[in-house]
Amino acid sequence: MKFSIAAAVLALASAVVAHPGAGYVSTPEKEANFQQNFQKFVTACGNGNQVSCCNTETKKVGAPLTAGGLIPILDNINLEDFSLLKGCSKVDVAAVIGVQDLLNSNCKTQVSCCKVGDTNQVGLVNANVDLKCAAQNII
């Protein structure tokens, strides 16, 4: 897997905005601000990656969890806010108008930056999740 988890998490952390609460009311100013932040997220996601909507959070990874030497790259990453996801589908970033309402109604879990292409898992233990997605809330 050539996807740099640390780079993706760093890029996503720079584009994070708060998720609107139940009493959230959209205004033209809020929509424009969201569109600007969403475009920053798309840019931070980078080439060879795509913005995806992931509707199933398989496991919330916490800071006490360690890879136990099985996955050395994860030993040096703060996993407190990292999630394993499945059920991810591409978000069409060309249609940014009303994207906040689209994401709020269709993305039940998180908007993520995902590596384009198949995730090949090789080894004794394989997870039934999209390991190619770095998940971080942006809405």
UniProtKB/Swiss-Prot annotation:
PROSITE patterns: HYDROPHOBIN. Disruption phenotype: Leads to a 'wettable' phenotype with drops of water attaching to the mycelium, whereas water drops off the wild-type colonies. Conidia show a strongly reduced tendency to float at the water-air interface of conidial suspensions. Triggers an increased activation of human neutrophil granulocytes and dendritic cells, characterized by an increased release of the immune mediators interleukin-6 (IL-6), IL-8, IL-10, and tumor necrosis factor alpha (TNF-alpha). Keywords: Cell wall, Disulfide bond, Secreted, Signal, Virulence. Disulfide bonds join 45-113, 53-107, 54-88, 114-133. Transmembrane segments: none annotated. It is found in: Secreted; Secreted, Cell wall. Residues 1-18 form the signal peptide. GO terms for cellular component: extracellular region; fungal-type cell wall. GO terms for molecular function: structural constituent of cell wall. Self-assembles to form functional amyloid fibrils called rodlets. Self-assembly into fibrillar rodlets occurs spontaneously at hydrophobic:hydrophilic interfaces and the rodlets further associate laterally to form amphipathic monolayers. Belongs to the fungal hydrophobin family. Aerial growth, conidiation, and dispersal of filamentous fungi in the environment rely upon a capability of their secreting small amphipathic proteins called hydrophobins (HPBs) with low sequence identity. Class I can self-assemble into an outermost layer of rodlet bundles on aerial cell surfaces, conferring cellular hydrophobicity that supports fungal growth, development and dispersal; whereas Class II form highly ordered films at water-air interfaces through intermolecular interactions but contribute nothing to the rodlet structure. This is Class I hydrophobin A. It comes from Arthroderma benhamiae (strain ATCC MYA-4681 / CBS 112371). The lineage of its organism: Eukaryota, Fungi, Dikarya, Ascomycota, Pezizomycotina.
